[in-house]
A protein has these predicted regions:
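Acidic, metal/ion-coordinating pockets
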Residues: 2, 10-409
Length: 409
């Protein structure tokens, strides 16, 4: 009996030791899953998804998103940076972009590379191939490509842009390499959430070879506008959240045009959670559009993100000044029992600062700008309006009616 009891005690010791080792193994595996999993944006097979009502029960992680205005690489910026990096031009903004889960920008110019000729004047643009890597260096993970400059270098420019972005691992949509690709939904997965991103423009400055190469809606009553809405409905059925990037509106005005007034509510009705507008080269209002008990965040225009021009000849004094001011929109996509909600929304006004004949480029938050810097800005030589106080006043007048938090203090 004594021998049997000893053996049983040994069995218990071995069982206990085995249990401890198993628990340690499971703990190590859990830690590895947290620290070595890729929670950044991952493209998924286009067109994948479930039915219209997606189950959010198992999804608890929110996704923080930052949207920017137009990246417009005009001649002074190209002369400063050449085919190299953007240096420390975005140093004041970088921490904000690095801290989010997903940054979406409007890439206003083709990234066709040196072989197609680098230009930033006469409203015909083309950027160096290195630009795609610059986007990645500054934590921009996704770009909208449907805009009026998409075809500035024709079909080859469209193809080169897509190739350069692919090589830099930057997600993109709005221009396409085939009809089949055009008919698919672009979905990125971030923190386990499937986010569909749709991109359309009112038109392009230059013609392109095939209708499927660029998403262009032309007018709010066109057949292509119905294709746009069908894209949004399809995206709604294939993703947890839907973001629609629209290149629309009238340049150099705070007011909305007919295309915005008509299509905005229709896009919301079709299933967009967020609408990101660009093209007017100035900020425009933001609002919540309510349809069928749903609320869609609509940012009519975020203005310029990165640009370099003073005394823009097509604008009056107000919008020559406001050409230098844009906004970042930050928001969280939060899963819930009835679908994704948009929360923690805020608008961060920014200033493109440069001095003299396009020197000392610096992108800054307006809240950190000073009257001394405003006095040194190149635009101040032509406009006494260009003061920090006046810029802040304009931003308040545009965004305050939305009730969205404005980061100015």
């Amino acid at each position: 009996m004594k021998h049997k009891r000893t053996r049983l005690r040994m069995d218990r010791v071995l069982l206990l030791a085995g249990s401890v080792l198993l628990l340690l193994f499971l703990a190590v595996m859990a830690v590895c899953a947290v620290f070595f999993s890729d929670t950044g944006p991952r493209p998924t097979a286009a067109g994948q998804g479930s039915d219209t009502t997606r189950n959010q029960a198992g999804k608890t992680q929110r996704v923080s998103v930052t949207a920017t205005g137009d990246i417009l690489l005009e001649e002074p910026l190209l002369n400063t940076f050449g085919s190299g990096s953007w240096q420390d031009c975005l140093a004041d903004i970088d921490p904000l972009l690095a801290a989010d889960d997903l940054t979406i920008a409007n890439m206003e110019v083709p990234i066709g590379g040196e072989e197609l000729g680098i230009t930033g004047i006469d409203y015909s643009f083309n950027a160096p191939a290195r630009t795609a890597q610059n986007l990645k260096d500054h934590s921009i993970e996704f770009v909208s490509l449907a805009n009026n400059h998409a075809a500035d270098r024709g079909t080859q420019g469209i193809l080169n842009t897509r190739r350069n972005l692919d090589e830099a691992e930057i997600g993109h949509t709005g221009t396409f390499g085939s009809q089949e690709e055009r008919n698919q939904t672009n979905v990125v997965t971030v923190n386990g959430m499937d986010i569909a991103i749709v991109s359309w423009t009112y038109d392009t400055n230059q013609p392109y070879d095939q209708e499927w190469q660029v998403n262009s809606f032309y007018s709010p009553d066109s057949a292509q506008s119905q294709v746009l809405l069908e894209d949004v409905r399809r995206a709604r059925s294939q993703a947890d959240a839907v973001i629609v990037c629209m290149h629309w509106g009238t340049e150099f005005t705070y007011g909305l045009n007919d295309a915005q007034r008509i299509l905005g509510p229709q896009i919301a009705q079709a299933g967009a959670d967020v609408i990101i507008g660009n093209h007017p080269h100035t900020i425009q209002p933001a609002e919540w559009i309510e349809t069928d008990g749903r609320k869609t965040l609509c940012l009519w225009s975020l203005g310029n993100f990165l640009s370099s021009a003073y005394q823009v000849d097509r604008a009056d004094e107000t919008f020559q000044d406001m050409y230098e001011v844009g906004a970042l929109a930050a928001f969280d996509l939060v899963p819930g029992a009835s679908g994704v909600r948009v929360e923690n929304t805020r608008i961060i006004p920014i200033v493109n600062h440069f001095e003299g004949e396009y020197e000392s480029f610096r992108l800054m938050k307006l809240k950190d700008y000073t009257e001394e810097l405003a006095a040194a800005h190149s635009q101040r030589r032509f406009s006494d309006l260009f003061t920090k106080d006046w810029l802040v006043q304009q931003v308040h007048e545009v965004f305050d009616p939305s009730g969205i938090e404005l980061e100015l203090d």
